[in-house]
A protein has these predicted regions:
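Histidine-centered divalent metal-coordination motifs
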Residues: 69-75, 133, 188, 251
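Conserved beta-strand hairpin/beta-sheet module of binuclear metal-dependent hydrolase folds
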Residues: 1-58, 138-151
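Active-site HxH/HxHxD metal-binding segment of metal-dependent hydrolases
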Residues: 21, 42-123, 283, 289-290
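Aromatic/hydrophobic pocket-lining residues that form the small-molecule binding cavity
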Residues: 76, 168, 248
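Metallo-beta-lactamase
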Residues: 34-37, 42-44, 124-216
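Short, solvent-exposed loop/turn segments at secondary-structure boundaries
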Residues: 102-106, 159-163, 197-198, 239-242
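Short hydrophobic/aromatic-enriched beta-strand-loop microsegments
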Residues: 87-94, 149-151, 238-240
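C-terminal regulatory/interaction regions
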Residues: 216-326
Length: 326
């Protein structure tokens, strides 16, 4: 999908309720010249198939540089694969390096606020530090074409999770002030063709949510973030409750830092024993292996069904009936 003169999008369908509609992989650069990819999806086969298939069918070239908007695995999961199979140089957010331990090649470049990636053909990609969703969140901007790559700082079909609300609000206002902003390419969801309106909507939404939280607290008595979340999101998909609670806690932290709410410290549970942690890790490993094996068997079954329709019924007939005109 062509976004601008230098930008193409590979939109991969995603069933995760946290990732509405699509997960976006973006290719930047003049076709036939050096290319940069921003985010490359989770370490799952279908992301790799989509990207390799697109490169083979449309780009007919390989990736020179692969980078990411932040460390979360649905954006960084294929960095080792991009290095090994696409032979790409890898660039990551500088302060995301410790968060990517074990998931990146041994040799990587790092990016920080103010850096510029210069590609062949005069394409200049600005690097913008936009913490808030995560501590290492970056956005990338091609000012000449007005194209912003927002990662999970803004999504195409919903609001995002926020780890540091004060930083996030500053990041939104910074993006709102970008010159020549025309289109936004989010980490998940549809391409945004009204980016300034969407940014302002995000700012307004966070202000609205803060006021709703204050309204609940004005009811009197100490209350947990979870109970506040249940009041604010009564009909939310249950699979998204913890994400919603995380955002409520981000609001409460900012309110506490500003001296507007009092915090009664909770009582944490005792840490799990090393043996229990190891059992849980092994359970997850065995479960994931079983799921992977099940998917393989499902693929084999599907292929067998296709073959059964493509070929004559040799399982029924050693010598099938034959027919001749009388």
């Amino acid at each position: 999908m062509k976004i601008s003169e230098s930008v193409r999008a590979v939109l991969v369908a995603d069933e995760n309720p946290m990732h509405p509609d699509f997960t976006g992989i973006y290719l930047i650069g003049k076709q036939g010249r050096q290319s940069l990819t921003i985010d490359s999806g989770e370490a799952l086969d279908h992301y790799q198939w989509f990207l390799r298939g697109y490169l083979a069918a449309v780009e007919r070239e390989e990736i020179a540089i692969a980078t990411i908007t932040h460390h979360h695995s649905d954006h960084s999961g294929n960095l080792k694969w991009a290095k090994e199979f696409l032979k790409a140089d890898i660039s990551i957010p500088a302060n995301g390096r410790p968060l990517l331990k074990g998931r990146i090649p041994s040799k990587v470049d790092t990016l920080k606020d103010g850096d510029v990636i210069d590609l062949d053909g005069g394409v200049r990609v600005q690097v913008l530090a936009t913490p808030g969703h995560s501590v290492d969140s970056l956005c990338f901007y091609i000012e000449e074409e007005g194209v912003l790559f927002s990662g999970d700082t803004l999504l195409g079909s919903s609001t995002t999770t926020v780890s540091d609300l004060a930083a996030y609000r500053k990041s939104l206002k910074r993006l709102l002030d970008l010159p020549n902003l025309k289109v936004m390419c989010p980490g998940h969801g549809k391409i945004i063709n009204d980016p300034r309106e969407r940014l302002q909507m995000y700012i307004n939404h966070r202000d609205m949510r803060e006021q709703q939280i204050l309204n609940v607290l004005e009811g009197g008595g100490a209350i947990s973030s979870w109970d506040i979340m249940l009041q604010l999101y009564p009909d939310i998909d249950k699979r998204l409750r913890r994400a919603a609670d995380s955002n409520v806690r981000s609001h409460l932290k900012q309110l506490a830092d500003e001296g507007r709410v009092k915090v009664y410290e909770g009582t944490p549970r005792k840490p799990k024993s090393a043996a229990r942690v190891q059992r849980e890790v092994e359970h997850v490993r065995q479960r994931d292996l079983a799921i992977k094996h099940g998917r393989k068997l499902e693929a084999e079954r599907s292929r067998a069904e296709v073959r059964a329709q493509e070929n004559p019924p040799t399982s029924d007939w050693k010598e099938p009936p034959r027919f001749e005109l009388l």
